[in-house]
């Protein structure tokens, strides 16, 4: 009987682990879930001032790059995938609303806390090594995502188009 209970317990742990790893990606349920693309020619405001306010070195590109933000839910967690295809960057940030997550970006550690403000997704990003904070707001209006970036008093915006089939 004891062996049966141990086997049953182990099966349950294995089944739960497999189930959580195989949870389907949910692309709907919140306005900001989905895939959003900004081409180089798409609209932006105040981008160079934002890059300067961050204190990035001059070799950092001031020009706009094709940028893709994808947000989905899988199990109990959300994922924010940031892609810059021209720079071969593809960063998957797994998060839970209201909880801080720490990631590495290049040589820097970033602390990010995502939360909702009405229908908007907000991310407060801290860069301890630089003593800087970025306040990002993801606001979906129709088939567009308007992302606002704020450092100190400098606010920049970038417009993204929603992709009809985010899994593609």
From Swiss-Prot:
Per the record, which residues fall in region SAHS-c3? 113-162
Asked whether the UniProt record includes Ion transport among its keywords, one would answer: no
Q: Where in the cell is it found?
A: Secreted
Q: What is its main location?
A: secreted
On induction, the UniProt comment says: Expression is highly induced during desiccation.
What keywords would UniProt list here? Secreted, Signal, Stress response
The region called SAHS-c1 is annotated at: 26-57
Q: What if the gene is knocked out?
A: Affects slightly survival under dry conditions but does not affect survival under frozen conditions.
A GO CC annotation given for this chain:
extracellular region
A GO term, aspect molecular function: lipid binding
List the signal peptide residues.
1-19
Q: What does this protein do?
A: Secreted heat soluble protein acting as a molecular shield in water-deficient condition. Tardigrade-specific intrinsically disordered proteins (TDPs) are essential for desiccation tolerance by forming non-crystalline amorphous solids upon desiccation, and this vitrified state mirrors their protective capabilities.
Q: What else is known?
A: Trehalose, a disaccharide essential for several organisms to survive drying, is detected at low levels or not at all in some tardigrade species, indicating that tardigrades possess potentially novel mechanisms for surviving desiccation involving tardigrade-specific intrinsically disordered proteins (TDPs).
Q: Which family does it belong to?
A: Belongs to the Secretory-abundant heat soluble protein (SAHS) family.
Query: Under what name is this protein listed?
Result: Secretory-abundant heat soluble protein 33020
What organism is listed for this UniProt entry?
Hypsibius exemplaris (Freshwater tardigrade)
Q: What is the lineage of its organism?
A: Eukaryota, Metazoa, Ecdysozoa, Tardigrada, Eutardigrada
């Amino acid at each position: 009987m004891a062996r049966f209970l141990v086997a049953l317990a182990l099966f349950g742990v294995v089944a739960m682990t497999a189930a959580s790893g195989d949870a389907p990606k949910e692309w709907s349920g919140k306005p900001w879930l989905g895939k959003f693309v900004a081409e180089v020619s798409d609209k932006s405001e105040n981008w160079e001032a934002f890059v300067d306010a961050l204190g990035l070195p001059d070799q950092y590109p001031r020009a706009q790059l094709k940028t893709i933000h994808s947000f989905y839910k899988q199990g109990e967690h959300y994922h924010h995938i940031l892609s810059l295809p021209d720079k071969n960057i593809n960063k998957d940030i797994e998060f839970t609303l209201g909880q801080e997550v720490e990631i590495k970006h290049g040589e820097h550690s970033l602390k990010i806390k995502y939360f909702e403000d009405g229908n908007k997704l907000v991310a407060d990003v801290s860069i301890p090594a630089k003593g800087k904070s970025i306040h990002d707001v993801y606001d979906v209006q129709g088939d567009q995502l308007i992302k606002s970036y704020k450092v100190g008093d400098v606010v920049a915006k970038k417009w993204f188009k929603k992709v009809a089939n985010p899994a593609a």
